[in-house]
């Protein structure tokens, strides 16, 4: 047995800490969102915003997931990978999801670190850098719970981003090594599969990735360096994206909801979302601006110019992911997650290049004080978040007991009190890690009806 070095132990402890933060919060999460009840049932082929029928059937196996996902594809939307994953996790005990999402967040941190090192997959990572990346994910998310806690939200945003970053790694490594990186025949089928999964992710992300990918493949073709795995990966991405955008259900959904994608469609909500997101990421924009001004120092190291260009590409893609959302009829904060990850990755790329060059793009007085403040911020917001999650879980368990007692009867569960700590103040005290319980006051609401079907009690 090879003994672990001190640095490896620190790295393992850092990754374990990130794992447990996500695992603990998810273990306290109540199934309160209407979506998480709806996707527990076979898809019935009608609008999601119509209550489930009285004879709705729970998903009970992989064949049910396949049939339900296909029905969803035909009648509601193209995100069949995300919704099939949600159906799987909702069929499984909650503990399976809690472990899976915690491991996925750890993998996300590693993928961001590997990307920052030019696509090199290695466990020779500084524990400090890993912890800082984890802190960035905690402190600079526009909708933390919608990505890392809510089951259906994570399947729609977190997992597609992990698939995409994993898919990008070989292309990034190829670029950074001037084509010297070589892979076995195993990469082609693996990258094709990753492409299928990543391509069926988020609409505002994949359109730009596909466009940039076409330009890069054409550039490689002109240089005579085209390899089979490059074509296989892009073919998988294209097929996945085709299923996403050309799903018959997209047209059905737009017709039933009265929504459409139009040029120059800009609402106050979209403006507020972009403004808030810009303010949230402003430290990284400032850092990148200062780093680009010192690009001559960074370009002096081996491969430095490529790091600068790759960072600029990630930053450009981040902004494009955000801007194109102005065409969308909906602009939830969670849709900005891909933009956030690409911006953070751009900063990590420049930081790694600066470390190698011995440069410091930003000299901050009192850096030690800032580290202590960051530690204090995390400790305080995590403690507040943990406490509120515990209180919400207690509140929900009380009413869940009432629902279980009524199971199999026509009695209607009447929730007479709202969850504790719903005021806006608690959102700020948790650092925007507070989640809203999805149950509504309207008994006929589709989410309430889905909950009633789930516990086999009376409802609209």
Map each language-model feature to its residues.
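Short, Lys/Arg-rich, polar N-terminal cytosolic tail immediately upstream
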Residues: 1-6
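Membrane-interface micro-motifs in multi-pass membrane enzymes
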Residues: 125-175, 275-279, 319-350
């Amino acid at each position: 047995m090879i003994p672990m070095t001190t640095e490896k132990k620190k790295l393992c402890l850092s990754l374990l800490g990130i794992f447990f933060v996500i695992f603990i919060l998810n273990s306290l999460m109540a199934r309160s969102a209407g979506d998480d009840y709806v996707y527990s049932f076979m898809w019935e082929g009608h609008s999601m915003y119509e209550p489930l029928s009285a004879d709705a059937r729970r998903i009970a196996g992989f064949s049910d997931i396949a049939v339900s996902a296909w029905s969803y594809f035909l009648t509601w939307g193209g995100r069949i990978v995300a919704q099939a994953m949600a159906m799987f996790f909702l069929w499984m005990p909650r503990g399976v999801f809690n472990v899976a999402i915690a491991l996925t967040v750890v993998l996300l941190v590693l993928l961001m670190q590997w990307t920052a090192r030019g696509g090199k997959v290695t466990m020779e990572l500084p524990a400090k850098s890993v912890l800082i990346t984890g802190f960035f994910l905690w402190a600079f998310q526009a909708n933390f719970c919608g990505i890392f806690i809510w089951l259906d939200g994570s399947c729609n945003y977190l997992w597609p981003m992990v698939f995409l970053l994993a898919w990008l790694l070989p292309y990034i490594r190829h670029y950074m090594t001037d084509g010297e990186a070589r892979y076995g025949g195993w990469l082609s089928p693996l990258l094709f599969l990753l492409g299928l999964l990543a391509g069926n992710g988020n609409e505002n992300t994949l359109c730009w990735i596909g466009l940039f990918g076409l330009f890069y493949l054409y550039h490689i073709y002109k240089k005579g360096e085209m390899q089979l795995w490059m074509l296989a990966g892009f073919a998988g991405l294209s097929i996945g994206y085709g299923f996403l955008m050309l799903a018959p259900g997209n047209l059905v959904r737009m017709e039933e909801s009265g929504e459409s994608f139009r040029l120059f469609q800009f609402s106050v909500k979209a403006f507020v979302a972009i403004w808030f997101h810009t303010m949230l990421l402003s430290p990284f924009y400032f850092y990148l601006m200062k780093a680009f001004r010192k690009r001559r120092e960074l370009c002096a190291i081996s491969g430095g110019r490529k790091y600068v260009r790759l960072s600029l590409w990630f930053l450009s893609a981040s902004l494009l992911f955000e801007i194109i959302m102005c065409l969308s009829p909906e602009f939830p904060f969670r849709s900005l997650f891909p933009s956030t990850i690409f911006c953070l990755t751009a900063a990590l790329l420049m930081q790694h290049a600066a470390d190698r060059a011995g440069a410091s793009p930003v000299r901050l007085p009192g850096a030690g004080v800032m580290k202590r403040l960051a530690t204090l911020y995390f400790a305080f917001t995590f403690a507040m978040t943990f406490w509120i999650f515990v209180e919400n879980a207690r509140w929900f368990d009380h009413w869940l007991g009432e629902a279980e007692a009524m199971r199999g009867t026509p009695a209607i569960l009447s929730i007479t009190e709202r969850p504790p700590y719903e005021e806006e103040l608690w959102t700020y005290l948790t650092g925007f890690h507070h989640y809203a319980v999805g149950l509504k006051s309207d008994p006929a609401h589709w989410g309430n009806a889905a909950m009633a079907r789930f516990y086999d009690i009376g409802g609209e």
